[in-house]
Each structure stands twice: as C-alpha cells, then as structure tokens.
Amino acid sequence: MHIDYLCDHPELIEELATLNFKEWGEFRPGQTVEHRIEHMRESCGKGAVPSVVVALEGSRLLGGALLIESDLKLRPNLTPWLAGVYVKAEERGRGIASQLVDRVVAEAAALGVPELYLYTDTSQSLYARLGWEVVEELVYEELPVTVMKYVILR
C-alpha cells in the first residue's frame, strides 16, 4: 500500500468522488454526484491547498483524503481543513485512515500551516489517538459534530 496524489491518478477521480458522495451526500442537500466529481477534480492540487491524496494497492483505490481551504461554513475563520477521509469498508482496520491523515498533516506542515482543522460526527476517537484536540461541539446541517484541530507548529 502506498499514498500518492490523486492528480497523478486522474482515472480515480470519479471513483473517489462517488464513494465520498455515497458516504456524505445526504448531508449536502441539493448536491449531486456530478457536483462532487467536479469538486474533487478542482481540489486535485499537489503540494498545495487544495490537494487530494489517495491510498493505493497497485492501481486499486483503497481510500482518500483532502486538504482544503474551508469545510465548515459556520467557521470560515478556521483554515485549512482535513476533509473527506474515506477508506473502503472492506479495507478498514488496516491503519489506512491513519496513514491518510498523517500524509495530509505532513502536506500541511510542508506548506508552513500552523494548525489544521476537521469536523466529524463519528470518528472523534480515531483523531484523538492521532493527536487531534477537540475545539467545540456543534450542530451542522442538523447533525451533531465535533470540530477538532491539529497543532502543527508549536
């Protein structure tokens, strides 16, 4: 298994975007899978914000994660964000999500980013184990979520 930039594997954009849409599309009313594909395509930077990394086994997609400018409309002052951390169900339990998160943190650190943010409704313990701190609990799009941050530069 290795992690690479999605922009170096454009044939996987549609697959990753579709997986993201199936996982979180219900929380974005009015968004279509086509919109998610376009957003994924636009986010395909390399060594920049935005960028997308993917976990691969050979050429097979296992999961992905994004580094984006903003992910929570309620907190526009917080930037940048780790978003869309997703691992295919059959590949979970192998530490892939942790490796994707670590890679995005490393990307942000290389860019001189002092802090990175995320929000989650279910994976607080995963991120806490990786060193993320709770910022606040709130309701976003009718869903209780936890906003967390990772301090890169102390």
Give names to the regions the model predicted.
Residues G84-V87, G93-A106:
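Conserved acetyl-CoA-binding loop-helix of GNAT-fold acetyltransferases
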Residues E26-L56, L62:
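Active-site rim helix/loop that mediates acceptor-substrate recognition in acyltransferases
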Residues V52-V54, R60-S70, W81, Y86:
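Conserved beta-strand in the GNAT
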Residues H2-L16:
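A short beta-loop-alpha structural element at the N-terminal edge
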Residues L16-W24:
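Hydrophobic alpha-helical core bundles mediating ligand binding, dimerization, or RNAP-core interactions
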Residues A108-D121:
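Conserved GNAT acetyl-CoA-binding A-motif
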Residues L118-S123, E136-R154:
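C-terminal "cap" of GNAT-fold acetyltransferases
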Residues A128-L138:
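Conserved acetyl-CoA-binding loop of GNAT-fold acetyltransferases
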